[in-house]
Amino acid sequence: MRVSIRFTPSLAKAAKMTQHDTDSEDSPTAGIMPLSGVKVVDIANFLAGPMSSMFLGDFGAEVIKVERPGTGDEVRKWGNNKDGVGLMYKLINRNKRSVTADLKSPIGVEIVKRLVKDADVIVENYRKGTLEKWGLGYDVLSEINPGLVMVRITG
C-alpha cells in the first residue's frame, strides 16, 4: 500500500513520510479486509485517538498518522524503548503511515487539508476549539471534503 500525496516543493520539504505498515501486499489478508479502501487521517495523540484509528487499520483502512515535528506523539517514549521508540507507540500505531506536520503552522494546516481531500475519516482528540483555532475545524474540512467523517475523542 502506498500513500499518494502531491506536495508542492515547499510542502515536500516540510513533510517527512515514514512507513509503520506491518501489512504487506503479499499478505493473505491484503485487499480483503472489511475497511479496505477506507482512508483515515489520524491527527490525534496520546492513547484514545490513536487506539481508535489502530482498530480501523486492523480492519484494513489506510491510516495516515500526522505527528508534530521533533517529538512526534508523546507515547513514542512510553515503556521499554528500542531505538528511541517505546513498545506502546509501536502497538497503537501499527498498520499506519506517518507524516510530520506542525498543525499550528500554515504549512502544517495545508498538509492536513490536502490529506483530508480524499480521506473518508479524520480522527482527533484535541480540546474543544483547538482545531477551529488552527483553521482545521469540521466546518473548514467539510468544505474541502463534504463526505468526511470527523471522529472527536476526549477523555
Which residues does each predicted region cover?
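N-terminal helix-loop segment corresponding to the beta1-alpha1 unit
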Residues: 5-155
